């Protein structure tokens, strides 16, 4: 995949997210920036599976030095390597052994999957959905040596837009 050839949208209501890890996977993949190949990073050490599709927003730079991460919440698992247009609804703030790490929370645009069209902001998501996401990130590195995570909490769509705007500016230098 050549991201330079991809028409990237940074519109909060129609954001391009490159999926690296499908929902329910227990394998962590990362897109190699040079080759565009989807590389296996590791199999998760514990019994957890990703609670959502996981990827990144191209042409951004998060506080961890990588493109800003995004979870695309859906009842379906999108193929790793696919690009999903999604709309922001919130952000998960966390810290790990490498520093602060924000995860944008998004849903597929209604044209792709209208199942959750009623969700406009983080408060529209069920407590159970947020609890599953929080629990996953609090525990998915537990069995890995020298790795840890502290979940700081969730914030709304407005905060997510600020994280996105900061990441776009950081990428543009």
Curated annotation (Swiss-Prot):
Q: What molecular function terms (GO) are annotated for this protein?
A: inorganic diphosphate phosphatase activity; magnesium ion binding
Give the enzyme class. Answer: hydrolase
The EC number(s) given in the record are 3.6.1.1
Keyword check for Metal-binding, yes or no.
Answer: yes
Q: Which domain of life is it from?
A: Bacteria
Q: Where would one find the signal peptide in this protein? A: none
Q: How does it assemble?
A: Homohexamer.
Stated name of the protein: Inorganic pyrophosphatase
Provide the organism lineage as a comma list. Bacteria, Pseudomonadati, Campylobacterota, Epsilonproteobacteria, Campylobacterales
What gene, per UniProt, encodes this protein? ppa
């Amino acid at each position: 995949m050549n991201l330079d050839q991809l028409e990237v949208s940074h519109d909060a209501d129609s954001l391009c997210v490159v999926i690296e890890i499908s929902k329910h996977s227990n394998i962590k993949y990362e897109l190699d920036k040079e080759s565009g190949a989807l590389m296996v990073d590791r199999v998760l050490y514990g019994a957890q599976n990703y609670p959502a599709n996981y990827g990144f927003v191209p042409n951004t730079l998060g506080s961890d030095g990588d493109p800003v991460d995004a979870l695309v919440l859906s009842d379906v698992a999108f193929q790793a390597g696919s690009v999903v247009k999604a709309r922001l609804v919130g952000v998960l703030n966390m810290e790990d052994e490498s520093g602060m790490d924000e995860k944008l929370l998004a849903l597929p645009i209604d044209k792709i999957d209208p199942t959750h069209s009623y969700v406009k902001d983080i408060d529209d998501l069920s407590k159970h959905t947020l609890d599953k996401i929080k629990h996953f990130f609090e525990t998915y590195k537990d069995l890995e040596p020298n790795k840890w995570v502290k979940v700081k909490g969730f914030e709304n769509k407005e905060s997510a837009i600020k994280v996105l705007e900061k990441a776009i500016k950081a990428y543009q230098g």
